[in-house]
Regions:
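Radical SAM/AdoMet-radical enzyme domain recognition
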Residues: 40-60, 68-155
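Accessory C-terminal segments flanking Radical SAM cores
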Residues: 175-246
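Structured helix-beta-strand junction loops
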Residues: 81, 106, 134, 161-162, ...
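Canonical Radical SAM [4Fe-4S] cluster-binding loop centered on the CxxxCxxC motif
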Residues: 2-38, 224-225
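Short, well-ordered beta-to-alpha junction loops that form the rim of enzyme active sites
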Residues: 62, 170, 225-227
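Short catalytic/ligand-binding loop motif for oxyanion handling, primarily in non-cytosolic enzymes
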Residues: 16, 27-30, 66-68, 148-150, ...
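A structural signal for short, well-ordered beta-strand segments and their strand-loop junctions
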Residues: 58, 88-89, 139-141, 164-169, ...
């Protein structure tokens, strides 16, 4: 079996303070971070204990994970496992990058978001170039607010041409975008048009819950982050039995 997992632990803190983010500049206690660390290690151990399956794992933390060493170590461990096909993580790229040398770079990938209100373009591009130099796969991206168009245009010019630069469309802002705004974002991201629609998925079957699941720090399985109803727990013996088309 090849199972794709979206992992989101109990981390809910970030070193950036973006106004649209509920976890902006939020801090956690040492005890809370230690709980997240323990949960993450349990998850890594669980992956280790199931070599008969293939896994692809995407970390989508509520906050910035890579400023914490336990996430760096977890990615290094997971990427070295032969039954793990890919390990990717969402990040603002504010961490030191030396840890990537402990990873299998054929398996590692970073989803790196530029926050022009919190970091200079020069600093962000420098981090991207460092990743490129270290031969780490990554994509760069920006939330699609029109006020940052000049920064986004400059970013595209300064990044290597082979680096994909995506625009994360803000659905609730789409009615306020001018045709020129949409044209600009499409010129930066050739896949932008796919991100500006609400797709009619309600009530339709999909692979979520069958070959793709989300997992939280306690091991609770859900079809995805957007469907809150639990379907099982990876730490229970019958976890495979709940995987089915829905």
């Amino acid at each position: 079996m090849h199972l794709k997992i979206l992992y989101r632990g109990s981390l809910i803190s970030c070193n950036y303070g973006c106004e649209y983010c509920p976890f902006a500049k939020r801090q956690q206690t040492a005890a809370e971070l230690n709980l997240d660390k323990q949960q993450l290690q349990r998850f890594v151990d669980w992956i280790t204990q199931h070599p008969q399956h293939q896994f692809s794992i995407l970390f989508t933390p509520w906050g910035e994970a890579l400023i914490h060493k336990h996430y760096q170590q977890a990615l290094a461990q997971l990427t070295q496992m032969p039954h793990v096909n890919k390990v990717a993580i969402q990040t603002n790229l504010s961490c030191n990058l030396d840890w990537v040398e402990d990873c299998n770079k054929d398996t590692l990938a970073l989803w790196a978001t530029f926050h022009p209100e919190w970091v200079s373009r020069q600093t962000y591009v420098s981090q991207c170039l460092e990743l490129d130099k270290r031969k780490v796969r990554f994509s760069a991206g920006v939330v699609g607010f029109p006020q940052y168009k000049n920064e986004i245009a400059a970013l595209r010019q300064e990044l290597p041409s082979h680096v994909y630069l995506w625009i994360n469309a803000v659905k609730k802002e789409l009615p306020n975008l001018s045709p020129e705004d949409k044209s600009f974002f499409s010129s930066i991201d050739p896949l932008y048009h796919l991100n500006i629609h609400h797709y009619p998925s309600f009530g339709r079957s999909c692979r979520a819950g069958e070959s793709v699941i989300s997992v939280d720090g306690e091991g609770t399985m859900r079809r995805c982050h957007f469907i809150k109803e639990p379907i099982g727990n990876i730490y229970h013996q019958n976890w495979q039995e709940v995987l089915q088309e829905r």
